[in-house]
A protein has these predicted regions:
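Phosphate- and other anionic-substrate recognition elements at nucleic-acid/protein interfaces
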Residues: 1-170
């Protein structure tokens, strides 16, 4: 779905990363919200956008669609492996319930498989410097959920992802 506003959501058990891209001026913003406030935020943005004739595309990262995204290390004990498995399962369920609630309110949701990790950060995740290079985002600091959500919104918009770090293009 093409939109005037793109909302990318990176679901998590405590706080969901929310990235918003307004195509007019390519204005990028991001925040973290708990489950219920995430639903309210999306509904409020859609309501405000519809009043002025804008379309909103909502994209949720569906990590539950990835069977091979392992978080274990060879050194992990059985207890650590069980704890990680529980946490990943809870995160997957949060994402599924988020999609279910949004669809219950008549909101069309696009599911996005996790994007390829090809960045300079730990575990090849995107860094703050890289996301500001991609989006022109002016926030001083960001956490991983915000960066992932912003990247989801940017990717869904179809805008180019060109990164210039230390005068090198990736």
């Amino acid at each position: 779905m093409r939109g005037d506003i793109y909302i990318g959501i990176d679901p998590d058990t405590h706080l969901n990363g929310i990235g918003r891209l307004d195509m007019a001026g390519r204005k990028a913003t991001a925040t973290n919200l708990p489950f219920a406030l995430t639903i309210d935020y999306v509904r409020d943005v859609i309501k405000a956008a519809h009043r002025v004739g804008q379309k909103v595309a909502v994209i949720v990262e569906c990590s539950w669609g990835e069977a091979h995204n392992w978080h274990l290390k060879l050194s992990d004990s059985k207890a650590v492996a069980a704890k990680k498995g529980y946490a990943v399962g809870a995160m997957h369920e949060t994402g599924k319930k988020l999609v279910e609630m949004l669809e219950n309110y008549g909101i069309e949701v696009q599911l996005q498989r996790p994007l390829m990790k090809c960045w300079a950060g730990a575990d090849r995740k995107i860094t703050h410097a890289e996301i500001t290079d991609v989006c022109g985002w002016d926030k001083k600091r960001s956490n991983q959920e915000e960066r992932d959500a912003m990247l989801i919104a940017w990717y869904a918009s179809g805008l180019p992802i060109n990164v210039r770090t230390n005068n090198k293009t990736k």
